[in-house]
Amino acid sequence: MKQFRVTNEGDIQTTLRGLEVLSVPFLNKGVAFTEEERKELGLKGFLPPKVLTIDDQAKRAYEQYSAQPDDLSKNVYLTALHDRNETLFYRLLNDHLGEMLPIVYTPTVGTAIQRYSHEYRKPRGLYLSIDDPDGMKEAFKQYKDQSDTIDLIVATDAEGILGIGDWGVGGIAISIGKLAVYTAAAGIDPSRVLAVVLDAGTNQESLLNDPLYVGNQHSRVRGERYDQFIDDYVALARETFPNALLHWEDFGAKNARSILKRYKDKVCTFNDDIQGTGAVSLAAVLSCAKASKVPLRDHRVVIFGAGTAGIGIAEQLREALVREGLSEEESYKRFWCIDRNGLLTDDMDQLLDFQKPYARSADEVKDYQRNGDGGGIDLLEVVRQAKPTILIGTSTVSGAFTEEIVKEMASHVKRPAILPMSNPTTLSEAKPEDLIEWTEGRALITTGSPFPPVEYNGVTYHIGQANNALVFPGLGLGTIVTKSKLITDGMFEACARAIAGMVNVGVPGAPMLPKVEDLRTVSATVAVEVAKTAMKEGVATEEPEDIIQAVQDAMWYPVYKPIRAI
């Protein structure tokens, strides 16, 4: 499929000529093609005569970006640039990563996904349909004899997009956005990645009734046919790209867990919503434990939102508690998990399999007041009874952490750790400024969405964002460098400890996590620790002597390479 290759010396060779060169985003330099390249590649007359540098182009691109009237327009602009000139896109993103990450990734990508069919301009990645299994085979056949050309595949079925639910084929945009972060943060070569949407239909009524919708316009397929679709995808992906890391993104809760369970011990794969969210949350909790001077093993955790993300966080924290010396039984008893029906208890009907280990004994909570909707035990009552030291929100219920709940928690904890993790900002369980005021500046806060610093009593509180981008780029890079056969639980803990080790929580108002602007440094640090752990745990198939150098050598940078005609 590819009509170009990158040589060992770093330059690019291509068989394409003229307008064909300009149509390939990885090759296109626009007016930065040199005179020699213009002549050799047949570009004379197809470009204005002046040759500019990538610095000039980046300056102009930022002016154009800044002129866009709103965040969605900025996303559309960056998408168009990505589809036109990939190197310039990443140069711009690297120059303004903190500013642009919320545009190419959460939260703005959610709006872009909702508008996908109406803003559609150009395909990118693979669109694999459950209604066309032969078409899926044909798509992978296009990569015949190119088994070493792809290091990373991000796939979604788009049933559980961010906090907005089922958005069908438009979910390809989350795969694309995720890969953009991999490249911007960790230098994963953009020519060696692949975005995939697994279109099994949609249950979103607005899409089913939209004549412009470009995906399968029928209800979501479930059961054996869906499972076979996933199995066929994995088999084809592994057969075609045997060394590729398979990243699962934004599947529905039930499928996300079953797919991960089916494959985690067989292929190099992970689910970012479950394991990535868990790892970045563990990093925040490790920082909170250090700041509060209370050992991790002595904390009590309430999780409000017992879905894929919430239980994923619980699992990462619980495994860390076991490694700190608690028994399996003791570790489960450190968690109180709440869903829409209230505190999970073992007498509840319709508990999901992954929720059952975290359900409290009905006898244990018999004296709790059942004042929630439907007779359940609500968050306030759980906080009163459990006296948590850590409160985590993954519910997408805006304002769920009320003043009464927060003050109740703060009345029995010197430094309450409060993590409203839901995205986007409008769905956050609480605002940092309120949490700081209600706790008189004592709260240790980490949020899922970006929030500005808060001034209180002469102290500036910087709010750490528990963005999965702190985890998955470095995890991917470390995995690729070592060509790991699997991704282990130990590799995720290595991510968390590396991230937590990069902040100085002793400074008043310090964030519990590194800044998003420092993602490049964070990702390199995480990659080194992941690689070390992969080698230690015996899943690495390549073991570089100098891991730091190997990680640096593997990182792609957005600079124009010489292009030669062949």
From Swiss-Prot:
Binding-site list for a divalent metal cation: E249, D250, D273
Top-level taxon of the source organism: Bacteria
Induction section of the entry: Weakly expressed in glucose or malate minimal medium.
Catalytic activity: (S)-malate + NAD(+) = pyruvate + CO2 + NADH; oxaloacetate + H(+) = pyruvate + CO2
Residues the entry annotates as binding NAD(+): A306, G307, T308, A309, N423, N468
EC number: 1.1.1.38
Keyword Oxidoreductase: yes
InterPro entries: Aminoacid_DH-like_N_sf (IPR046346), Malic_enzyme_CS (IPR015884), Malic_N_dom (IPR012301), Malic_N_dom_sf (IPR037062), Malic_NAD-bd (IPR012302), Malic_OxRdtase (IPR001891), NAD(P)-bd_dom_sf (IPR036291)
CDD domains: NAD_bind_1_malic_enz
Disulfide bonds: none
Keyword Coiled coil: no
PANTHER family: MALIC ENZYME-RELATED, NAD-DEPENDENT MALIC ENZYME, MITOCHONDRIAL
UniProt name for this protein: NAD-dependent malic enzyme 3
Species of provenance: Bacillus subtilis (strain 168)
Source taxonomy: Bacteria, Bacillati, Bacillota, Bacilli, Bacillales
